[in-house]
A protein has these predicted regions:
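Non-catalytic beta/alpha edge segments that cap or flank active sites
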Residues: 1-165
Length: 165
């Protein structure tokens, strides 16, 4: 896999206000690096749909990233709006990615079905919502790590099969 640029977004209103310490973002940065991506930025945004959607669009359209990973905001709480923001930003869903992540979580928690994370593409960028805690990030990441290089290689090709590096 040629170099893949990635952005990691931690989604948490409290962390965006400077309350507490982000443990999930660094765990997701480490995952991205393990799968061969170069993380160009890790930012924190509050649980606000328009802000999340705007950052997803920015990193896909102008930030030069082939991979955007989010952590947080995927549960059932009223302020968990990451899936809605992601659906608004993507062109196509990649449901198998989110399904594999949920299936992996099933082995570790009886609350796996409460995750609403989605994955999809915007142009040539893959966007994936991860859960909001380090152990779940590890479990979900292990479920999809082997498929990410192929997915990213497919997105890098044009209709004639040529790479866009």
């Amino acid at each position: 896999m040629s170099e893949v640029r990635a952005a990691v977004i931690t989604i948490s209103s409290s962390l965006a206000r400077g309350e507490g310490e982000d443990e999930s973002g660094p765990a997701l940065v480490a995952f991205a690096e393990r799968v061969g991506a170069r993380v160009v930025d890790h930012e924190t945004v509050p649980d606000e749909r328009e802000l999340i959607e705007g950052r997803l669009r920015y990193w896909s359209d102008h930030g030069g990233c082939e991979l955007v990973l989010t952590t947080g905001g995927t549960g059932l709480s009223p302020d968990d709006v990451t899936p809605e923001a992601t659906r608004a930003a993507i062109d196509r869903e990649a449901p198998g990615i989110a399904e594999a992540m949920r299936a992996a979580s099933r082995e570790h928690t009886d609350k796996w079905m409460l995750s609403r994370g989605v994955a999809g593409t915007r142009g040539r960028t893959l966007i994936v919502n991860f859960p909001g805690n380090p152990p779940s990030i590890e479990q979900a990441g292990a479920a999809i790590a082997h498929a990410l290089p192929h997915a990213l290689a497919l997105l890098a090709r044009d209709d004639a099969g040529h790479r866009h590096d």
